[in-house]
Amino acid sequence: MALTISRAQYVATYGPTVGDKVRLGDTNLWATIEQDLLTKGDECKFGGGKSVRDGMAQSGTATRDNPNVLDFVITNVMIIDAKLGIIKADIGIRDGRIVGIGQAGNPDTMDNVTPNMIIGASTEVHNGAHLIATAGGIDTHIHFICPQQAQHAIESGVTTLIGGGTGPADGTHATTCTPGAWYMERMFQAAEALPVNVGFFGKGNCSTLDPLREQIEAGALGLKIHEDWGATPAVIDSALKVADEMDIQVAIHTDTLNESGFLEDTMKAIDGRVIHTFHTEGAGGGHAPDIIKAAMYSNVLPASTNPTRPFTKNTIDEHLDMLMVCHHLDKRVPEDVAFADSRIRPETIAAEDILHDMGVFSIMSSDSQAMGRIGEVVIRTWQTADKMKMQRGELGNEGNDNFRIKRYIAKYTINPAIAHGIAEHIGSLEVGKIADIVLWKPMFFGVKPEVVIKKGFISYAKMGDPNASIPTPQPVFYRPMYGAQGLATAQTAVFFVSQAAEKADIREKFGLHKETIAVKGCRNVGKKDLVHNDVTPNITVDAERYEVRVDGELITCEPVDSVPLGQRYFLF
């Protein structure tokens, strides 16, 4: 017999459904559920008097020998994903990967159970009815200055770190390069203890090929070209030749001082080959004043770093001091001051906001401890989205913010994965991918996750006093969970490496325990492949006034005095 309940009762019990709108944190962004994959009346819910019990939503006969039985299920959860959209479903996990997005349960007693989403006695259950699930974030601009960065990253919802470095050496303070085979081996061994997925860039600044090849063979998933080592046309050409040969990505921080050429010379050296440009606006470095024009090319995968996101009243002042420290400049030296001033331009920073909203800039990253904050990639992304809604209005005519939300979440999930040849494994919650999942209460969305799941195992979470009688008493703060303890760390995170390194079996050679996964398809991608962020308009920059125009139209916006997801969330 059917039971009719009010919509309010349904939402209170099972969470929102199709047409319901959910506010993201204290932003002005509202996500509307587009599709509900659950069967009404057969929702799975765990707890006293609920449905996930033997003979009801849990099978009384299915063992784990049955490949359709789940290890872990998140029930009734709202999903925000660049590829799946904004939907309601159960998420089924087995062997550390997502095996189903649909209806979990017991097919002996329930209709429409997704075939490979059986709940059995071997299945752990987490109620997601009033939570939002997103894919773990990917930060592709990491200066590996200190290992404690990984903790701050995962606590913010970022589960994959790609970059370079060797610790607090001056070369690492300024550039994201792990130079040479010896350091590559040491850094892989050190990263065994980190609870996140990791990939390292080799130093791409070399005008001959063999010194680049040996770094890739030692495990580098890509090469980083940085102006502090000399971003010359010869260096660019050499790095891209090796990249094409060995199927890895090249990231570049171009020549701010225009010492060896201008933007046009760099683009000529790139010669149509795919490349990932860092802080493409230019405050973080790059051809002054017009590196932002690189975003219009179809072979350029343009990224931002988070210190310029979004444009606020404090952005300019903060950058000048950061720049002096990170690039070893001296305020007493006029040339150093001029160098700093050339990089910090309000006009191009304002344009960067709008280019993100238009889908011209495709990727968000941090520039960790080197002019950026590793724990603020997610926050700054949504602050930018909110600012653009307030200043530019709605995108499209859907009557909701879904398209803008999908555009912005793609910038730190699927698009960096596509850029670096790892989208087969991470970057979205699609079936088959590693179960790196972040769960948020809507009121804390983008700021403070409830639970971070790595490869199907809870790795970090908000946790109260361990001596309390229940899990919630204060002090509540992030603590590593069992997925980030002992030998489990090696089973819940992976290393991304080159195909050459995988063939050479560096896992065995270096004595590593984490799985190594080779990057693939780095050279046949382009801007057209970046989800919701594939726009390639004509961009011009006035060399004297720094004004930015897109297809002839001036683009600019005002800095704001305050942002959402800010101080009110960090009183304690």
Swiss-Prot record:
PROSITE patterns: UREASE_1, UREASE_2, UREASE_3. It is found in: Cytoplasm. One of its GO terms (biological process) is urea catabolic process. Its EC number is 3.5.1.5. This is Urease subunit alpha. The keyword Cell inner membrane does not apply. It comes from Haemophilus influenzae (strain PittEE). It is an enzyme of class 3 (hydrolase). Its cofactor is Ni cation. Residues 136-572 form the Urease domain. CDD domains: Urease_alpha. HAMAP family: Urease_alpha. The keyword Metal-binding applies.
